[in-house]
Amino acid sequence: MYPPKLQRFTTTDLVFTCPFCQEGLQLQERSLACRNRHNFDLAKQGYVNLAPNAKASQHYQKESFQARQMVLEAGLYDHILAGLDQIITKLQPASLLDVACGEGFYSRQLESRSAGNYYAFDLSKDSILLASKADSRQQVKWFVADLAKIPLADQSLDAILDIFSPANYQEFKRLLKPTGSLLKAIPGSQHLIEIRKILGKEAYQPEDIDLHLKEQMQIQDQLELTATYTLTPEVREALLTMTPLLQQVRLEDFDWTQLTDITISATLYQAQF
């Protein structure tokens, strides 16, 4: 009998694949193991590391994921969550993967609203640790992995979530069933426009990402999701900490007290190969 935090992995035989030899992984005691004797221990928090030799980007440290968790829990991305929920309710996927999931907000929220097997990964072990600790329902299969080679079996997924993250269309095509869908959110032109104005930057231009997606896949549905929120000082500080737009910016060079509202804008696509 497995403890509750590890029970979720009892239904994953041969869905996970070995990152070293690509053979299917099966649960053996408290590890996932392949027939070539590669073993990956299940952490007591409820995740498995399938990228033991990989290093996460220095720009995505524990503090940035904690800040992101605060911003998401404050509701600033709830309209994007609602759009995802709308499409997932329509599709009813039996299996879903959240790529580059960060601290796991979308997977946790969506899994609590709809049935299905939810998988979620990030290259950052810190983020997956946060995600698994926050998963009170203990249902999402959290794992550390690399987007370049996702350790899941061919045609094992009904849907993939890609929210504000890079895409690997070759891997997505391999993983999705023939009728499977990609749900991809890209920033809208007004995304974080208030921060861009303070920095003296022009509005975001999403055309290149939009064009590349349409070259790779057929668009089945498209939602425009934009909302503006009032910021508390605490959420403003967390937003400034988590935003990739500010990674190369000296925050002390600007007066951020003037940032009292923020616009979160995205285009959400449902697409198929």
Regions found by a protein language model. Give the residues of each.
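A short acidic, Gly/Pro-enriched loop at the edge of an enzyme's catalytic core
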Residues: A148-A159
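Conserved Class I S-adenosyl-L-methionine
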Residues: T12-L14, L225-F273
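Conserved SAM-binding loop of SAM-dependent methyltransferases across substrates and taxa
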Residues: E103-S114
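Class I SAM-dependent methyltransferase Rossmann-like catalytic core
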Residues: S57-H79
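N-terminal auxiliary segments of SAM/dcSAM-dependent transferases
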Residues: M1-S57
